[in-house]
């Protein structure tokens, strides 16, 4: 089994490209991770996701702990076997979903007590329990438990939240079972305050995680402020370890973040947009529901090799989406995931060639 490692092959200014080696294979960076929240990327077969060029998926601890439960998944051979995906899987800690989905929740030093959004059952999620669940799932990359600081937050509110995340990170690290080829990432917080981001990074670097995520962005602060944070936050992190920007997935945001030193991304945007009839193309977004596509016999993109573009017209996709056929969601999602992986491939090629990004989609 391979050791977990991050090898930077090319660098242009702050942008890096390379390979992350894991127990479940290699992943190219910069990487975009399709979101498989409940053990599936919606409207896609696992092998179809792989065909788009994805090297890694994201799973969600909160949803999987509720249904079908981590204990059931481990009895069935782990998440990789359960969902028939043999490449790396990163699982988030569940903290963000607890904060955003659970109406009845209480944050204490111990963790977060909450009621399930499904049936109202009461649960307690702690750094130790979150780490245990991810271990049972067999996650390649485990995320430390954190509090995602809401935006806007005052300096004092952000400081209190960041310090709690640091204490939880320490407990998450102590609970993590180290195995060859597996990793745990810490999450730095601090909202939009440079002093807090620097302190958070300093505290977490001392815990020697295998990689680091920048959390608490893309929560309403806007691109300008997000980029302002990214102008300095990655520089507080080790050069030789992966940097993951959580929940960011607009093409222009990805390109801007890579140019500031980010290596990994995840977002529901391509899959959710696909199911809602929106396609990403290098010429901009296409709302396939628009009546102007009803008689359009051309593909979404002439040079895209996904099945939606190879085999079907915009008129057919328009028809499927307008009548709510499942195939419409499948084809639109396949196209969008292909677009995002092609974008990452193009980004990696530009870094290899030492070229500035002259595109934003």
From Swiss-Prot:
Keywords annotated in UniProt: Glycosyltransferase, Metal-binding, Queuosine biosynthesis, Transferase, tRNA processing, Zinc
Could you mention a single GO BP entry for this protein?
tRNA-guanine transglycosylation
- State the protein's purpose: Catalyzes the base-exchange of a guanine (G) residue with the queuine precursor 7-aminomethyl-7-deazaguanine (PreQ1) at position 34 (anticodon wobble position) in tRNAs with GU(N) anticodons (tRNA-Asp, -Asn, -His and -Tyr). Catalysis occurs through a double-displacement mechanism. The nucleophile active site attacks the C1' of nucleotide 34 to detach the guanine base from the RNA, forming a covalent enzyme-RNA intermediate. The proton acceptor active site deprotonates the incoming PreQ1, allowing a nucleophilic attack on the C1' of the ribose to form the product.
An annotated Gene Ontology molecular function = tRNA-guanosine(34) queuine transglycosylase activity
Q: Could you tell me which residues belong to the region RNA binding? A: 247-253, 271-275
Q: Enumerate the residues binding substrate.
A: 92-96, 146, 189, 216
Identify the residues that bind Zn(2+).
304, 306, 309, 335
Q: Is the keyword Transmembrane in the record?
A: no
Recorded metabolic or biological pathway in which this protein acts:
tRNA modification; tRNA-queuosine biosynthesis
Which Pfam families does the entry link to?
A: TGT
Q: Record's InterPro entries?
A: ArchSynthase1/Queuine_TRR, TGT, TGT-like_sf, tRNA_ribo_trans-like
Q: Which organism is it from?
A: Rickettsia massiliae (strain Mtu5)
> EC number(s) for this protein?
2.4.2.29
EC category: transferase
Task: Family membership, please give it.
Answer: Belongs to the queuine tRNA-ribosyltransferase family.
Kindly provide the name given to this protein in its UniProt entry. Answer: Queuine tRNA-ribosyltransferase
> What reaction is this protein's catalytic activity?
7-aminomethyl-7-carbaguanine + guanosine(34) in tRNA = 7-aminomethyl-7-carbaguanosine(34) in tRNA + guanine
What Gene Ontology cellular component terms go with this record?
Answer: cytoplasm
**Active site (record annotation):** 92, 266
Q: How does it assemble?
A: Homodimer. Within each dimer, one monomer is responsible for RNA recognition and catalysis, while the other monomer binds to the replacement base PreQ1.
> Organism's domain of life?
Bacteria
Q: Required co-factor?
A: Zn(2+)
The record's free-text note on cofactor binding: Binds 1 zinc ion per subunit.
